[in-house]
Amino acid sequence: MIVNLSRLGKSGTGMWQYSIKFLTALREIADVDAIICSKVHADYFEKLGYAVVTVPNIVSNTSKTSRLRPLVWYVYSYWLALRVLIKFGNKKLVCTTHHTIPLLRNQTITVHDIRPFYYPDSFIQKVYFRFLLKMSVKRCKHVLTVSYTVKDSIAKTYNVDSEKISVIYNSVNKSDFIQKKEKENYFLAVGASWPHKNIHSFIKNKKVWSDSYNLIIVCGRTDYAMSLQQMVVDLELKDKVTFLHEVSFNELKILYSKAYALVYPSIDEGFGIPPIEAMASNTPVIVSDIPVFHEVLTNGALYVNPDDEKSWQSAIKNIEQLPDAISRFNNYVARYDFDNMKQMVGNWLAESK
């Protein structure tokens, strides 16, 4: 089997974490003949003992939206297809992102969400999710996704048989995180680099939090992040809000462990790793009242209507009513351990024979 990680961006991101854990689980169950990856990641995978096929760094993803990169990938992917066919023939190929390699029929892609179908970040993304991805989903041998909510959305939106779609949940290792009982007076927002993350809804409802708490926003250097910074200035919150970029995992663990709560009011999500990571850090989470969070977090989270000030007020007040035991969220986090992911990878291999 070939694993296509050619569009995988920088290490440490949610996509990177999912891909590495997926690869680890797959390797314990099946033979992995080679990894397709960007040159910048080649050394990492070679040290793990994988045979590597490299692609130029320019085709991998970054935290910045690029109008050029998808076009470069589209052209380059045909050359990559020929390389793969010549070297590996019709071997099974799986990609942990939604990007296909043309001409290859025996491949599986991973569609983490179809949010861009409804809320695209660019015109190219809109065209891709509404037309090109639809064709890819129909052509591919199988499709993976990260929640049953997204599975249903893919089947309905692209009119494909749900039996062609398998779910493999994200994995979080509780021991990677720091559990603290004592919390500091700041809310934390993680991954707030794009408009659908909707952290502006929390900022603009400043009356419910800014008198008693601060806000730390971990995000990329994107247009949306710049708009948030301007909003903070306009609302006279500069002394209450801190923006952090390029945060390491070790730094993020500390932020999680000390936060009074994570706020994650997304309009749409495929799964949502930060709320699980926050729970692994004994930190309460406030999330938007959308179906995927009810699937993933069940009754472990506090739910809000992000546009309703009273809803935010109620959620923040309810944090005080939560159990204070340091193990209060362990049962929710345990649903997403590595063994569960490995079992779901095994189920996919059985379903897609």
UniProtKB/Swiss-Prot annotation:
Catalytic activity, as annotated: alpha-L-rhamnosyl-(1->3)-alpha-D-galactosyl-1-diphospho-di-trans,octa-cis-undecaprenol + GDP-alpha-D-mannose = alpha-D-Man-(1->4)-alpha-L-Rha-(1->3)-alpha-D-Gal-di-trans,octa-cis-undecaprenyl diphosphate + GDP + H(+)
PANTHER family: GLYCOSYLTRANSFERASE WBBK-RELATED
Protein name: O-antigen chain mannosyltransferase RfbU
Residue intervals passing through the bilayer: none
Keyword Hydrolase attributed: no
CDD domains linked to this entry: GT4_MtfB-like
Membership in a protein family: Belongs to the glycosyltransferase group 1 family. Glycosyltransferase 4 subfamily.
Disulfide bonds: none
MF terms in GO: glycosyltransferase activity
BP term (GO), one: O antigen biosynthetic process
Pathway of action: Bacterial outer membrane biogenesis; LPS O-antigen biosynthesis
The EC number(s) this enzyme carries: 2.4.1.378
Record key words, sorted: Glycosyltransferase, Lipopolysaccharide biosynthesis, Transferase
Described function: Mannosyltransferase involved in the biosynthesis of the repeat unit of the lipopolysaccharide (LPS) O-antigen region. Catalyzes the addition of a mannose to the rhamnosyl-galactosyl-undecaprenyl diphosphate intermediate.
SUPFAM superfamilies: UDP-Glycosyltransferase/glycogen phosphorylase (SSF53756)
